[in-house]
Swiss-Prot record:
The gene is rplM. This is Large ribosomal subunit protein uL13. InterPro entries: Ribosomal_uL13 (IPR005822), Ribosomal_uL13_bac-type (IPR005823), Ribosomal_uL13_sf (IPR036899). GO terms for molecular function: mRNA binding; structural constituent of ribosome. Part of the 50S ribosomal subunit. NCBIfam families: rplM_bact (TIGR01066). The lineage of its organism: Bacteria, Bacillati, Actinomycetota, Actinomycetes, Micrococcales. It comes from Kocuria rhizophila (strain ATCC 9341 / DSM 348 / NBRC 103217 / DC2201).
Amino acid sequence: MRTYTPKPGDVQRQWHVIDATDVVLGRLASQTATLLRGKHKPTFAPHVDTGDFVIIINAEKVALTGSKLQKKRAYRHSGYPGGLKSTSYAELLEKNPTRAVEKAIKGMLPKNKLAAQQLSKLKVYAGAEHPHQAQQPKPYEFTQVAQ
């Protein structure tokens, strides 16, 4: 019997909506990365983008455990010597909560050409509203949220 390889035209993509209220950031990122890659499907192949679209709402209400809010830092570099900038996650969540969630999810995707394609299927919104009602997204529930 031959190994099944999914073709890009055969992939059935669904839309999922995730409410990030009181969900731990790492748990949110790992579950979202699984949905974006398509690892929850029986037709998963690591070299084909079989993932679904994911909408994350209420990114501003995501939870970080312990003292990570003050101690964990987000880094970026301008490309020039001495151009390394760092920001605490408390500042990042206050200024741009969507970037904090996107950064965590991007870190859990593979470091290859498919990652950009998979990340383009991620839509993150700070509030409860999103413009994707026409796609009829299905709610995705987490079994455990922050205490």
